[in-house]
Amino acid sequence: MTDNNNKNNYTLNPKNMQKKLVLLALMAFSFGTTYAQYPQLTSAAKARVDSMQKAWAKHQAEVWAKAEPIVKKEAAEGRPYVPWAGRPTDLPQAKIPAFPGAEGGGMYSFGGRGGKVYVVTSLADSGPGTLREACEAGGARIVVFNVSGIIRLKSPLIVQAPYLTIAGQTAPGDGVCVAGQTFGVDTHDVVIRHMRFRRGETNVDHREDSFGGNPVGNIMLDHISAEWGLDENISFYRHMWHPGADYKAEKRGTVNVTIQNSISAKALDTYNHSFGSTLGGENCSFMRNLWSCNTGRNPSIGWNGIFNFVNNVVYNWVHRSSDGGDYQAMFNFINNYYKPGPLTPKDSPVGHRILKPESGRSKLSYKQYGRVYATGNIMEGNERVTKDNWDGGIQVEGQRDTKGYTEQMRAYEPFEMPYVQIMGAQKAYDFVLANAGATLPKRDIIDERVIDEVRTGQAYYVKKLPKDNPYGDVSGLAEKSQAEDGTFKYRRLGNDSYKYGIITDPRQMGGYPEYHGTPRVDSDSDGMPDAWEKKYGLNPNDASDASLDCNGDGYTNIEKYINGLDPRVKIDWRNLSNNYDTLAARGGVEE
């Protein structure tokens, strides 16, 4: 690695790559003052950022002014609006799962049950028939798709009104992908399935997540593909509640949250921020997910309380696997699978790290760490850590292991967990690679490449990069932050890191694919195709039947369609022995 004052985008020669990565890991602590510098913007870029943020804030205020009266009206009619929620009990819970197969802290979210059905028919950023129209509306709502393709956002799309379900599995053909800007959740009772969020922008002006926001709670995310974020791919752990103009904002944990069967991969390292996720909250659970080819935060724990991390797969981390929390935090790390990749420094502590609890947020004059229950985790290639996760897999700041802290940290029984079906780590590895991400209506080529990299240990990359900004669009980057070739001067990895899985531009792994599909016939625009309604005795010319429940099982007719249920069969969904992913079992929505 060259001197900090010179260009340090060295080439990753495979012969000495591991030696350099060990050095990188050992120097990680010092990066806070030297290498982890944030990019500096030009004056013009700063002015652009200020102008954009003011415009976005104005737009959000206008959106909320229209939605708020509807939200308040529905609250008076039985759908409470609780923006200050900070405890799991602050939000009411449904009596049946958000959908069959929902598990964990968010499994009893209402989503948009019983609300208006919005059918997305346009890929435009805004206007009639768009995703933005549906998400920015007030009132309970369920969003289905009758179009396929890329929805390229021109500004962040923020969900402010509660009670929303987005059913990405209903898109025809190849499905949809949200690109260009952040998709954010700033409310409660949100259910999202089979959606792709790939921001994909590398301009230094706006370095944000692909999927995140200011989430309040009752969040149920299933089969999400979150990639190409410039900060993190997907983050849910806290929200800031503003009591009023004369009060300071209060930080509160996101409550009742689940992320399951999802992918957080290929965060963009253009400015040293290839980070997977910051997660946490109260009554939170994260299971059967994949974190792949993010340098750090795989994931980071951003809240105290009990952090449930079960049956996940982590691959090709560089300087951070999982870390965070404080002395109040409690961790359940159960039956996860860790696979070091080409850029994982296998000969350093981080190379076999399962979890590094931290104390920095505690603001104490002494070191005190949270408590950890860790069992059944596999560290591929490391028999010692696999046999005993505490033999090097659980680490603390500044030490290779937990020597001197183990007695305080180690728990021998799991902390209280919400309902989660748990499998062995090896079975979880196979399950995640076969099922994670937006697999319906079909898994796209980007996720196929991500999964194949994990299986083979070899990165997919294009052999000939584009001539224009092949390492990312760094227009707006101040001269003092630029290397000789115009890239970010203080980037830790070399320009060819994409050959080993860490990318700085989506084009390095092929860029956005095309998505095609034929719209379904839906005469009454109620989100249920005519053929499906006719088959099950509903009226294809009466939109009101979407919100009815033809068999009394608790799911409305539109929910029966989007979740692959047979309306002729009534099932007791309160009985968790019946709680399985009916949509996956059917292979998608019925045509």
Task: Show where each model-derived region lies.
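Right-handed parallel beta-helix
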Residues: 163, 168, 172, 188-199, ...
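Acidic, divalent-cation-chelating loop motifs in proteins
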Residues: 520-524, 545-553
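Extracellular beta-strand-rich, repetitive "passenger/adhesive" scaffolds
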Residues: 115, 169-176, 195, 541-544
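Extracellular beta-strand-rich solenoid/capping regions of secreted or surface-exposed proteins
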Residues: 132-139, 151-165, 176-193, 199-216
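Acidic Gly/Asp/Thr-rich repetitive segments characteristic of extracellular carbohydrate-active
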Residues: 98-143
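Cysteine-centered, disulfide-bonded loop motifs in secreted/extracellular proteins
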Residues: 524-536, 540, 554-562
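Bacterial Sec-dependent N-terminal signal peptides
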Residues: 1-37
